[in-house]
Amino acid sequence: MSKKFVHTQEELEKLSLKELENLAASMREKIIQVVSKNGGHLSSNLGAVELSIAMHLVFDAKKDPFIFDVSHQSYTHKLLSGKEEIFDTLRQINGLSGYTKPSEGDYFVAGHSSTSISLAVGACKAIALKGEKRIPVALIGDGALSAGMAYEALNELGDSKFPCVILLNDNEMSISKPIGAISKYLSQAMATQFYQSFKKRIAKMLDILPDSATYMAKRFEESFKLITPGLLFEELGLEYIGPIDGHNLGEIISALKQAKAMQKPCVIHAQTIKGKGYVLAEGKHAKWHGVGAFDIDSGESVKKSDTKKSATEIFSKNLLDLASKYENIVGVTAAMPSGTGLDKLIEKYPNRFWDVAIAEQHAVTSMAAMAKEGFKPFIAIYSTFLQRAYDQVIHDCAIMNLNVVFAMDRAGIVGEDGETHQGVFDLSFLAPLPNFTLLAPRDEQMMQNIMEYAYLHQGPIAFRYPRGSFILDKEFNPCEIKLGKAQWLVKNSSEIAFLGYGQGVAKAWQVLRALQEMNNNANLIDLIFAKPLDEELLCELAKKSKIWFIFSENVKIGGIESLINNFLQKYDLHVKVVSFEYEDKFIEHGKTSEVEKNLEKDVNSLLTKVLKFYH
C-alpha cells in the first residue's frame, strides 16, 4: 500500500514542519483531482486540511473519538485513515462515502449539522464511566454553531468539566472577525497557565470585594466581550484558545497540545479560508461548497448542459411570480438559499424572505407566527432537513391548522450524498398528521398549478419535488388542482392500473410505454394528492381493475401503499396492490441511475416485474 498520505500518529510526529506542510499541499492536490472528477464538497475540505492533519498528529485516531460535524469536510481524515487507495471511488456507487460512516472505520455517522458536540459529550460520559483516558475531538464549522443543538451541548459540556476538545473551524460563514492584534494576543494569553491561575485568583478576590468594586470588575469583564469572542465560551465554562491561523500547522499543533494538557473541555478557535489552495474557490462560499465534476484549469463544469430547468428553478420562478402577485406571501430557508432557489426572492424582497441559517426548528415556528398574523409563508426546505423540525411541524403548524406551505425540495433519491440525505421519508412522517394536505407535481406545469393552489389552500400543506429536472415535460395536459382530486391520464379496459405520485408518474409512464410496444396496456392515474386521496376515482377504478401498481419515491412503510391499503380496507374493496416504493432500509450513495438499478427501481427492472402479471 502506498504510504504517501497514510500515516500513523507516530509517523506524523517524526515529520518536520516543512514535511507536514508538503503533506498538506499534496492532500489538497489529491482532493481537487478527485472532486473534479466525482463532484463533492470542495471548498470546505480544502479549508480543513491542516486542522485534520494536526488532529491526527496530536491525538490517536485509533483511540480518541474523532467527530466531524456534518462530516462533509472529512476528506483529509479519510486520506489519513488508510483510504488513499479507494479515495478515487469517493461518492461513487459501492465506493467511499463523502461523509463519515462507522462501516468505513469512522467513529460516528454524520450528514446533518450541529450534532458533533452532543456526540462528544456523550462520548465523554461513556469514557468516564469506563475509567478510560481517551479524549473526544470534535471538528465543527462556525456555520453549524447557528443551530441551537450545538449550544445545548456546549452548555452541558462546560458544566461537566470532561476532557474534550472542540475545534471550531471559522471560515467566516457566521462568526464575525475579532478586532485586531490585541484580540489575538488576549485570546492566546487565555490558554497560558499563568492566565488560568490569575483568573481564578481574581474570582476569589471578587468574592470579598465590596459591591461597588465588584460592579466595576464586572463592567471591565463585559468590555472584553467587545474585543474577543472567547468569553462567550468561557461563560459557558469552557476553556478557550484562539483565534489562531487554521492554516499554520505550527500554531494548530501547539494549540491542540495545550488543549490536550488542560484535561478540561476546551474550544480552539481556528480561522480558515474555504477553498484554500485552489484560487478559483477561495472565498467563494456558495459556488464551491458542493460541486459537480469540473475542469481544474478553468473551473467550468464538465457536465453536459441540461436544457431542461431544474425543479428548484421552476419553484423559484413560480414563487417570484406569486410573490409579485400576492403581497402577503413570505418565505424562509434554513441555510439553503441557493439550494432551494430562495436566494432570488431574498434578493428581490429582503423584507419578506429570509435565510435563518441552520435553524430549521426556528424557521418553522417563526413562519407559524407569521401565518397566525395573516401572512402566507412558504418554507423552502430539503425533504431530509424537514426531519429536524418535526415537532414544530406538529405542535406549531398542524395543531394550530395554520396556512403554512412546505415546499420540500430533493424528494426521492438524491444520489451521491447518500443515506443521510435521501428524501424518502417525508410522506411517511407527514401523512399521519391531522389537518395536513399532501401533494406532488409530475411536471413543470403541474408544479405551477400546485403552487397557485397551495397559496389559496386553507391549512398546512406540503408538496414535494425532485432534485434535478422533472422527467416528464408536456406528455399530458395539466389539470386544475382541486382538493383530493386525481387525474386519469391513460384510460382503457385493462384490469391493471398504474398509480403514480410525483416523479413516480414518469416512471409509471415509461413502463407503460414499453408495455404498449409489446401490445399490452394499463390505466395510468396521477394521484396528485397523497392526502386526501381521490376516493371517488379509486372506487370507480376498483370496480374495473384487479391489480394496482404503486409508483412513488418514498419508503413503503407509511407511503402510498399504506394509504391505498387503508382506503381499500375502509370500503372493503379487494384489489391486489404491488408497490414499487423503497424497502425498509437506508439507501446508499451513488449516481441516482446507478442507485435505482441496484435497488431494481430502474425502468427495465420495473418492467420485468410488471410483465409477470400479464398472461
Curated annotation (Swiss-Prot):
GO CC entries: cytosol
SUPFAM superfamilies for the chain: Thiamin diphosphate-binding fold (THDP-binding) (SSF52518), TK C-terminal domain-like (SSF52922)
Keyword Ribosomal protein in annotation: no
PROSITE patterns, alphabetized: TRANSKETOLASE_1, TRANSKETOLASE_2
Annotated pathway: Metabolic intermediate biosynthesis; 1-deoxy-D-xylulose 5-phosphate biosynthesis; 1-deoxy-D-xylulose 5-phosphate from D-glyceraldehyde 3-phosphate and pyruvate: step 1/1
Names of required cofactors: Mg(2+); thiamine diphosphate
Residues annotated for thiamine diphosphate binding in this entry: 72, 111-113, 143-144, 171, 278, 360
Keyword Plastid in annotation: no
CDD domains recorded: TPP_DXS (cd02007), TPP_PYR_DXS_TK_like (cd07033)
Catalysis performed (reactions): D-glyceraldehyde 3-phosphate + pyruvate + H(+) = 1-deoxy-D-xylulose 5-phosphate + CO2
UniProt xrefs under InterPro entries: Dxylulose-5-P_synthase, THDP-binding, Transketo_C/PFOR_II, Transketolase-like_Pyr-bd, Transketolase_BS, Transketolase_C, Transketolase_CS
Pfam families: DXP_synthase_N, Transket_pyr, Transketolase_C
Amino acids binding Mg(2+): 142, 171
Highest rank taxon of the organism: Bacteria
Gene Ontology MF terms in the entry: 1-deoxy-D-xylulose-5-phosphate synthase activity; magnesium ion binding; thiamine pyrophosphate binding
Biological processes per GO annotation: 1-deoxy-D-xylulose 5-phosphate biosynthetic process; isopentenyl diphosphate biosynthetic process, methylerythritol 4-phosphate pathway; terpenoid biosynthetic process; thiamine biosynthetic process
EC number, as in UniProt: 2.2.1.7
Cofactor binding comment, as recorded: Binds 1 Mg(2+) ion per subunit. Binds 1 thiamine pyrophosphate per subunit.
Keyword annotations of the record: Isoprene biosynthesis, Magnesium, Metal-binding, Thiamine biosynthesis, Thiamine pyrophosphate, Transferase
Family: Belongs to the transketolase family. DXPS subfamily.
PANTHER family in alphabetical order: 1-D-DEOXYXYLULOSE 5-PHOSPHATE SYNTHASE-RELATED, 1-DEOXY-D-XYLULOSE-5-PHOSPHATE SYNTHASE, CHLOROPLASTIC
Subunit structure as annotated in this protein's UniProt entry: Homodimer.
Record's function text: Catalyzes the acyloin condensation reaction between C atoms 2 and 3 of pyruvate and glyceraldehyde 3-phosphate to yield 1-deoxy-D-xylulose-5-phosphate (DXP).
Full protein name: 1-deoxy-D-xylulose-5-phosphate synthase
Lineage, top ranks: Bacteria, Pseudomonadati, Campylobacterota, Epsilonproteobacteria, Campylobacterales
